């Protein structure tokens, strides 16, 4: 299984995809590409991603792409309110009401600007509409006396990406955010992984029977 940005399905990459498909077919695999939206799998983020799965030919009939879940993901305000309020910031309730949509796509951290930010100008405008200052990250939640637009912390971005709060990231703020922003959202990876496991399990059950 491989994951990449949605642009991989553009016509300019047809030859690249076709080459991969031909090579894997020769090796006895059935290749397939699918555009999956993270928000269809409970992730509070606008994050379309292309997923590639290559299944061995004798197992391919047992594989199908995961179906979207029925429930809408929580808004950014619903998802992050407890983290925003962790230091007693009185503006957290009003902020939760403003952050009433899912997040724009998280990026992997900007080396050009010397540190983590939440994306280009258009993305920063989308974050501002949600009550978030997208020009950088904080190490901690806003303090009690804070006035203005708060920034996210790495832990907040990890939750937006679908990581459990117990997940640990290596390094300081910038390094941690780059790991988070470049990651494949775990709920989507898990959904695809379960389908791959199901295809493998069919063969195993058949052998046992």
Question: Model features per residue range: what roles?
Answer:
Residues 1-129, 206:
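Class I S-adenosyl-L-methionine
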Residues 84-209:
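C-terminal target-recognition/interaction regions appended to catalytic cores
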């Amino acid at each position: 299984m491989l994951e990449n940005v949605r642009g991989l399905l553009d016509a300019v990459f047809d030859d690249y995809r076709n080459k991969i498909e031909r090579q894997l077919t020769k090796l006895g695999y059935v290749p397939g590409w699918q555009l999956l939206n993270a928000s269809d799998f409970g992730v509070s983020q606008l994050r379309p991603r292309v997923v590639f799965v290559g299944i061995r030919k004798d197992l391919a009939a047992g594989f199908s792409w995961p179906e979207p879940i029925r429930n809408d993901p929580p808004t950014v305000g619903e998802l992050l309110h407890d983290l925003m309020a962790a230091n007693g910031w009185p503006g957290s309730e009003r902020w939760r009401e403003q952050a009433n949509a899912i997040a724009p796509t998280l990026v992997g951290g900007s080396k050009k600007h010397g540190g983590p930010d939440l994306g280009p100008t258009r993305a920063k405008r989308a974050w501002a509409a949600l009550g978030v200052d997208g020009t950088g990250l904080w190490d901690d939640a806003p303090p009690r006396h804070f006035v203005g637009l708060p920034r996210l912390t790495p832990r907040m971005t990890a939750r937006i990406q679908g990581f459990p709060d117990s997940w640990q990231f290596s390094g300081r703020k910038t390094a941690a955010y780059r790991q988070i922003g470049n990651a494949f959202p775990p709920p989507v990876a898990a959904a695809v992984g379960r389908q791959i496991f199901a295809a493998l399990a069919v063969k195993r059950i058949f052998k046992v029977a």
